């Protein structure tokens, strides 16, 4: 029974997240249905990061076991054929050993949050950015972000319904940069950690936005973290601006 590793790209807009639900469309359910249609088998996918409703991915990783030994290009192409016209693409498929687990073998996950920072709304990218029309200072946002790096109790930045056993996480990267392409003004928040709490990235993005418009200082952000003052955080940034961009595995 071979195990296949899939690299997956999807637009999260039409889906109620990754994880299969009884009555709502999800990315997991769509791919598992495609697996059944091409192989005749019922397989359960395990992914690296269970994205929320509306969150996108350009390098999600999942694994599944199938009884038959299929060519990897057949797996990729057959799944893509059965997934049409849904906005999901299987970018690659490869056979891996059974000690590989897309979720538990991961040593680092990467997310990107995009803020369109100009007066005019987005026409082409509206489903992939958070439009903030007032001026933001990316340097102030970056300075505040550095106060969140390291191992901390991130209770202030977790969802009330978060099921993680511990709120302690080690944030390895949280960088904020401004990117300009003509009239396109975008602020990009890039972050990496072994794992994140439910809504952590979106909560941090909303709080950093307040730092960018000078409603919070870097010291304020550090104090919110230290005192777990969730009521002082910024708004929960909308899901559409968040993308799962990659996952690292130990090469051993």
From Swiss-Prot:
Protein name (Swiss-Prot/TrEMBL): tRNA pseudouridine synthase A
Recorded family membership: Belongs to the tRNA pseudouridine synthase TruA family.
Keyword field contains Nucleotide-binding: no
Lineage top rank: taxon: Bacteria
InterPro entries in the record: PsdUridine_synth_cat_dom_sf (IPR020103), PsdUridine_synth_TruA (IPR001406), PsdUridine_synth_TruA_a/b_dom (IPR020097), PsdUridine_synth_TruA_C (IPR020095), TruA/RsuA/RluB/E/F_N (IPR020094)
Function of the molecule: Formation of pseudouridine at positions 38, 39 and 40 in the anticodon stem and loop of transfer RNAs.
Binding locations of substrate: 111
Top-level class of the enzyme under EC nomenclature: isomerase
Catalytic site positions: 52
BP GO terms, sorted: tRNA pseudouridine synthesis
Subunit structure: Homodimer.
Organism: Methylorubrum populi (strain ATCC BAA-705 / NCIMB 13946 / BJ001)
GO molecular function: RNA binding; tRNA pseudouridine(38-40) synthase activity
Catalytic activity: uridine(38/39/40) in tRNA = pseudouridine(38/39/40) in tRNA
Keywords, comma-separated and alphabetical: Isomerase, tRNA processing
EC number: 5.4.99.12
């Amino acid at each position: 029974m071979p195990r296949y590793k899939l690299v997956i790209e999807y637009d999260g807009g039409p889906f109620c997240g990754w994880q299969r639900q009884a009555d709502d469309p999800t990315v997991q359910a769509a791919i598992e249905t495609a697996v059944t249609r091409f192989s005749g088998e019922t397989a359960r996918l395990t992914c690296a990061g269970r994205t929320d409703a509306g969150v996108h991915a350009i390098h999600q990783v999942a694994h599944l076991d199938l009884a038959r030994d299929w060519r990897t290009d057949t797996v990729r192409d057959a799944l893509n054929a059965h997934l049409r016209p849904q906005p999901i693409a299987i970018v690659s498929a490869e056979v891996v050993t059974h000690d590989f687990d897309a979720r538990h073998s991961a040593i680092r996950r990467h997310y990107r949050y995009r803020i369109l920072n100009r007066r005019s709304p987005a026409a082409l990218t509206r489903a992939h950015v958070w439009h903030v029309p007032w001026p933001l200072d990316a340097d102030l946002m970056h300075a505040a972000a550095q106060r969140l790096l390291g191992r901390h109790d991130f209770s202030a930045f977790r969802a009330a319904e978060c099921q993680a056993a511990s709120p302690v996480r080690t944030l390895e990267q949280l960088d904020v940069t401004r990117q300009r392409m003509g009239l396109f003004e975008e602020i990009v928040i890039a972050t990496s950690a072994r794992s994140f709490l439910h809504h952590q990235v979106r909560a941090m993005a909303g709080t950093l936005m307040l730092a960018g418009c000078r409603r919070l200082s870097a010291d304020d952000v550090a104090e919110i973290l230290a005192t777990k003052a969730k009521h002082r955080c910024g708004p929960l940034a909308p899901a559409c601006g968040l993308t799962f961009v990659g996952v690292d595995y130990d090469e051993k």
